[in-house]
């Protein structure tokens, strides 16, 4: 479906420079876009790509348009002789692109008819809205509530007493255990598990060494998981239920694939967590935080609002102050790494030598005096 720039601006805002009747039917990167596609410039370092792009129109920030020779809604020297002549000027081209992309997906995706697939298993006490879409081999246990316009794809499991909020979409084989609350418009991708038991075991051992006897005693996890509105959870991510109170994911949190969130954690609103991060139990993460891929956060710590943890960093203590924190070792040339590792191994010997030299110098100074 093709849309005019005028139609896009009417829906999403912004200002048009060029032909308001220019039509676009999709989106593409600057260096690949054709005359029927809309591109965007989010980073000024790619400004040169705008000048050579074949895009029909470009989403661009005001300051970047000025660098191309246009300002105040009109081209200063007439139509451009190279590159696009049509622009939508907006303060945040990246976010604008995301909204337009979502609109094109929605337009291209035929709505699924409401109803329950014959192979689904639904307990008679469960409440399923008439507008919900229940796919093949879905299981909905006793007392569960499936709200309006929810879509449960093939193989989804919803445990007893769990609530799935309106407009949510659970992709194939996602599992939400008993006693969980999923807010409206949640997106839970394939294979994610919400509400499995937290990792809680009490040690019950006596003796030492080979004479040690006993075992680990499982601590029942009687809390649940409470997820706010507009949360997205990636494929194969696991969020453990609380030991006594709920694990809480606040509004608009975005969690990537294969993330582990331990029991009794609280993740603040608008925080984003990249893939393979691990967050141990009873940790609180503030609002608007960013957790990099494969970062590890110890249990029982608190991160304040607007904290950024870079990829592969390890957090072992609370970080209440906003800022960027790094503990990962970036990749370097293999030979350089080996030399650095050798130095690290010998740091204790170097320290001892320095102490010995300082002691000798101090003694010599005393003798000279």
Swiss-Prot record:
GO terms for molecular function: N-acyltransferase activity. Keywords: Acyltransferase, Lipid A biosynthesis, Lipid biosynthesis, Lipid metabolism, Repeat, Transferase. Pfam families: Hexapep, Hexapep_2, LpxD. It catalyses: a UDP-3-O-[(3R)-3-hydroxyacyl]-alpha-D-glucosamine + a (3R)-hydroxyacyl-[ACP] = a UDP-2-N,3-O-bis[(3R)-3-hydroxyacyl]-alpha-D-glucosamine + holo-[ACP] + H(+). InterPro entries: Hexapep, Hexapep_transf_CS, LpxD, Trimer_LpxA-like_sf, UDP_GlcNAc_AcTrfase_non-rep. The active site is at residue 263. One of its GO terms (cellular component) is membrane. Its EC number is 2.3.1.191. GO terms for biological process: lipid A biosynthetic process. Pathway: Bacterial outer membrane biogenesis; LPS lipid A biosynthesis. The keyword Acyltransferase applies. Homotrimer. PANTHER family: UDP-3-O-ACYLGLUCOSAMINE N-ACYLTRANSFERASE, UDP-3-O-ACYLGLUCOSAMINE N-ACYLTRANSFERASE 1, MITOCHONDRIAL-RELATED. HAMAP family: LpxD. Belongs to the transferase hexapeptide repeat family. LpxD subfamily. Catalyzes the N-acylation of UDP-3-O-acylglucosamine using 3-hydroxyacyl-ACP as the acyl donor. Is involved in the biosynthesis of lipid A, a phosphorylated glycolipid that anchors the lipopolysaccharide to the outer membrane of the cell. This is UDP-3-O-acylglucosamine N-acyltransferase. It comes from Burkholderia vietnamiensis (strain G4 / LMG 22486). The lineage of its organism: Bacteria, Pseudomonadati, Pseudomonadota, Betaproteobacteria, Burkholderiales. The gene is lpxD.
